[in-house]
């Protein structure tokens, strides 16, 4: 647990660590404040592994003291480490995303005269603490200690008040989401229920969905009621309306209330100093009835707050404890377990305790599963490493995610791309469900409907563009082998044709592997041939991949550095040609031949790192450091660059993630790299090896415990798998698990 703004002397820190190190659990090594600035968009809120519910401090509105304000700029997280103004706890949030969504259902504790305007009731705060499944903060204006914990589908908050009158507020008008509209209904003096509309993620105005809630307070209030922001009127109407343009308190109204800016308040008179009021909330994306079922099933009426908190912590220790590391610096262990923590947040549950969930793209209709249904499939990001991590260490969860994806196809007709609570947002490009499913299949996860999955993949890889929701620009891709400039975006500054094509090449390479595994030889050859179309983009003149016009000529003039720092670059999405040129993980040797051979490939790739052209926060080049190891004698470069990247970009500071965590993708890179292996080609059942960070790691897998040991420091001299020497730096998943123990012998020289 971390106490922000508290200074410890080095001597005290050393003494405490020395005494407690042996007793530390994995959860003790997690710092939820890592990644909460530098646009990492992580947050320190309370959540369980893959939980539907998260309880997140909301500090991005209401005060000029804040460095960042959600209403003053594009902003995609409910919490920023450097902000100072707290306006409540949000219930349900996304971690590591680039567009604003969720972060609503804001609860707040206040004292003194009642006010429901967040600009007035917000407060500075101190003494933040966060650990897996728990968050607390002291609200300066009110002298209130606010604490939060969570179960999979519900939350618990505990507010410790000073003497006097206290209030609990539920603000349904504000939040991170850009959507508006809510309803709240009084059920009893201590319980309310309702719904809030969410959606419009990443410019998708029609992709909206409701969240339902039931909220209970532990103490009977002395008063309670609704509020609503009144519309601004002029003239005579304004003269007759005392609440014109302001928040109106409804003290004599007891039925439901709807509107864009509504809420509910509970007041408690005569509180003793130190008296506590607890708030419990259940949520559902199906119905209010299910929100109540979720709350009742996961929290007994008399369950103490501390028991719920301890259960959340236990769940995290069980999940994090599937990987146990020894050695390395204390800070490295903290980086590792925090990265693993972030990698276990999304995808998250969307099914309720009764198995019900919102059907994919069938608004208002409900499905039922006898397992678990998952949501938040940010697949352009997570197809590269996060699902591979789940396959290796958490296969049961990955199976449910595979079933969730194939279920979406059965309900909607397409696999997901960037799915969010039953809505497809089409964010980013490519056909990223294919490499995820293929990768799992090739690594032995086969108890899902692979025939249905293959049908879905083949559909998106062959359907003409006018009818193709996954690949609307597939026609020239099939006819020409590439996507020309101007086909997808007439404005060349917004054209991302090369990026689109590269994603399709990778997906088709993976699909060819599955086709071959299923005995579909003709399909295997077809999709493999398509995956090599990237060669048409290679320009000997620039030495990079380069956008093509419809007539097959290269874009000119052309600057391969254009696109750095998210500036526009024709053909490329959020990056430069250098961020994409080596993004052919399924044919690295073929790309090297195009470049003039191994030596030129290595020199050019090394130049990308040496001249700062590598973007550690961008997915297409995320595996670049591992490409050196495809060539014998160059493996030391992989070890050097991965070590440098870890040391520079992954730290224990609040900015200790290199930009947006992308629902755990950057964190999954760190987890794999610190263990000494990485899945450098999505869909292929291989890992590329590098020097591990830790002296020993034990990883629980379906086939037993995989042990990774490191002896010495520096560069790899020898490796053994089991009791046999290992010469190849690329190893099959099956061989790794069969071997059981991977040992690295390091020496100081290369």
Positions of the model-derived regions?
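Accessory carbohydrate-recognition regions in carbohydrate-active enzymes
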Residues: 24-383, 387, 391-435, 441-502, ...
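ATP-dependent phospho-/nucleotidyl transfer catalytic cores
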Residues: 507
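Bacterial N-terminal signal peptides
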Residues: 9-18
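Bacterial N-terminal signal peptides that target proteins for export
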Residues: 1-10
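Sec/Tat signal peptide C-region and signal peptidase I cleavage site
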Residues: 19-23
């Amino acid at each position: 647990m971390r106490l922000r703004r508290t200074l410890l002397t080095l001597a005290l820190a050393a003494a405490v660590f020395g005494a407690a190190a042996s007793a530390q659990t994995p959860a003790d090594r997690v710092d939820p404040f890592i990644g909460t600035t530098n646009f990492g968009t992580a947050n320190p809120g309370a959540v369980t592994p893959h939980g539907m519910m998260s309880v997140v401090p909301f500090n991005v509105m209401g005060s000029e003291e804040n460095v960042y304000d959600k209403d003053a700029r594009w902003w995609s997280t409910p919490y920023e480490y450097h902000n100072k103004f707290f306006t409540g706890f949000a219930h349900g949030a996304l971690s590591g995303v680039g567009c604003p969504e969720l972060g609503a259902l804001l609860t707040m504790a206040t004292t003194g005269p009642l006010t429901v305007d967040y600009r007035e009731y917000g407060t500075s705060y101190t003494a933040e603490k966060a650990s897996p499944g728990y968050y607390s903060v002291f609200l300066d204006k009110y002298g209130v200690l606010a604490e939060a914990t969570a179960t999979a589908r519900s939350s618990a908050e505990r507010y410790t008040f000073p003497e006097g009158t206290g209030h609990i507020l539920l603000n349904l008008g504000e939040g991170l989401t850009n959507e508006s509209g809510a309803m709240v209904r009084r059920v009893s003096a201590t319980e309310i229920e309702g719904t809030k509309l969410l959606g419009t993620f990443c410019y998708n105005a029609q992709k909206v969905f409701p969240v339902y809630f039931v909220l209970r307070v532990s103490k009977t209030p002395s008063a309670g009621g609704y509020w609503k922001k009144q519309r601004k009127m002029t003239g005579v109407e304004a003269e007759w309306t005392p609440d014109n343009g302001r928040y109106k308190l409804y003290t004599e109204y007891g039925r439901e209330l709807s509107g864009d800016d509504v809420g509910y308040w509970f007041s408690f008179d005569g509180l003793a100093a130190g008296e506590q009021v607890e708030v419990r909330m259940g949520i559902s994306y199906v119905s209010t009835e299910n929100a109540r079922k979720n709350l009742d099933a996961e929290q007994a009426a008399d369950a103490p707050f501390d028991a719920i908190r301890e259960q959340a912590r236990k769940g995290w220790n069980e999940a994090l404890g599937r990987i146990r590391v020894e050695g390395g610096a204390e800070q490295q262990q903290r980086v590792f377990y925090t990265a693993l923590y972030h990698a276990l947040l999304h995808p998250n549950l969307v099914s309720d305790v009764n198995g019900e969930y919102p059907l994919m793209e069938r608004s208002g209709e409900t499905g039922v599963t006898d397992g678990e249904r998952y949501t938040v499939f940010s697949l352009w990001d997570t197809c590269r490493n996060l699902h591979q991590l789940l396959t290796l260490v958490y296969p049961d969860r990955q199976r449910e995610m595979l079933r969730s994806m194939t279920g979406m196809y059965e309900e909607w007709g397409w696999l997901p791309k960037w799915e969010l609570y039953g809505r497809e947002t089409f964010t980013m490009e490519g056909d990223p469900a294919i490499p995820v499913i293929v990768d799992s299949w090739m690594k032995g996860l086969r108890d899902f409907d692979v025939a249905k999955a293959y049908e879905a993949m083949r559909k998106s890889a062959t359907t003409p563009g006018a009818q193709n929701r996954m690949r609307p620009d597939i026609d020239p891709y099939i006819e020409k082998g590439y996507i020309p400039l101007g086909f997808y975006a007439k404005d060349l500054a917004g054209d991302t044709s090369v990026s689109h094509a590269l994603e399709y090449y990778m997906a088709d390479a993976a699909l060819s592997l599955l086709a071959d595994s299923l005995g579909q030889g003709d399909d295997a050859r077809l999709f493999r041939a398509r995956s090599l179309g990237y060669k048409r983009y290679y320009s000997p003149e620039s030495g990079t991949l380069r956008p093509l016009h419809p007539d097959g000529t290269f874009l000119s003039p052309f600057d391969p550095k254009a696109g750095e720092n998210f500036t526009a670059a024709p053909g490329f999405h959020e990056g430069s040609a250098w961020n994409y040129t080596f993004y052919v993980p399924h044919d690295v040797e073929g790309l090297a031949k195009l470049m003039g051979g191994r030596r030129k490939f290595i020199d050019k790739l090394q130049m990308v790192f040496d001249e700062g052209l590598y973007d550690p926060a961008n997915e297409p080049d995320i595996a670049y450091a591992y490409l050196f190891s495809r060539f014998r004698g160059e493996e030391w470069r992989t070890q050097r660059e991965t070590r440098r990247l870890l040391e520079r970009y992954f730290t224990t500071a609040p900015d200790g993630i290199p930009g947006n965590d992308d629902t755990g993708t950057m964190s999954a890179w760190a987890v794999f790299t610190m263990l000494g292996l990485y899945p450098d080609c999505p869909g292929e059942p291989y890992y590329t090896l590098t020097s591990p960070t830790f002296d020993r790691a034990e990883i629980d897998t379906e086939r037993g415990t995989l042990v990774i040991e490191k002896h010495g420091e520096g560069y790899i001299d020898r490796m053994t798998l089991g009791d046999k020497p290992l010469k190849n730096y690329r190893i099959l998943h099956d061989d790794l698990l069969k071997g059981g123990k991977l040992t690295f012998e390091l020496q100081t020289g290369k």
